Amino acid sequence: MSGKIPGRAILLPVSLVAAFLFIGVGTVLIGGRAGEILFDHPSKHFPYPLTFQNVMHVVFFIGLGELFARWRSGLQEEGHIGQRYLPEDEQTVLTARDLGPIRIRVAKAHSREHGFLPSLIDLSILQFLSSKSVDQTAAVMNSSLELIAHRVDLRYGIVRFIAWLVPTLGFIGTVYGLGASLSEAGNSTGDLNIKEVAKTLGVGFDCTMVALAQSAILVFLMQLIQEKEETAVNLAGDYTLRNLINRLYQG
């Protein structure tokens, strides 16, 4: 199984440092048109590095940090499947006397937030020991599985918000850039340089292009990682059903 999953108190500063490093190194190494697209450097409307693109980079890296935590969680949950918490042969039948040692082991392997499989096994064993009913145990397991799936979905709320926020910032940056360029052209007292105005307007659209690319990356990674976590939930339910619920003997 994977190690401890970093919390937001660790992820946020690490994500900010990574974003600042990306901006700093990119500013030094990437120049010309690519530098204008990615960083709006040199900027005509903002004191560098306080540009819309750089703000989007910071938000983007925060989203990547959240996804990293979810990816680590998915790896950890998948790792529980191979721990052989339950007998996996075709002959073993479990009675109430057999469940004590199993529960002692799984109780140490889960917490409130992590450990879908040991949590399901622990809860199912407790229900069976208290009710002596396989049907009630199966019903409790199904209810717990639905709650876990809902909890997994809720964990992606911030990532979904960031995937929405990034293109929103891009659109705002583009509108601001277009407005500022047109305002400067309108307030010009000399001859209007059409070429310079067109170049400035083009830079305004770069903000949206970068934002849409970042949003697409976040959504793509979110789909892959959420699928990994949801697969772990389904595998935990299937494992518990096959190797615990279907082996329970009420006699």
Predicted segments, located by residue:
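Alpha-helical transmembrane segments
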Residues: H57, F61-R70, F171-V175, Q214, ...
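Membrane-interface, cytosolic juxtamembrane amphipathic helix immediately N-terminal to a transmembrane helix
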Residues: M1-P13, K132-L165, L192-K199, Q226-V233
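Alpha-helical transmembrane segments of integral membrane proteins
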Residues: P49-V59, R160-V166, G202
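Membrane-interfacial helix-loop-helix connectors in multipass membrane proteins
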Residues: G35-H45, L182-G202
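Large intracellular
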Residues: S2-L145, Q250-G251
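Bilayer-spanning, highly hydrophobic alpha-helical transmembrane segments
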Residues: I158-E184, F205-L221
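Channel- or pocket-lining gating/hinge segments that regulate access to a cavity or pore
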Residues: A138, G157, T189-G251
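Perimembrane helix-loop junctions in membrane proteins
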Residues: L67-I81, S181-S188, Q223-E230
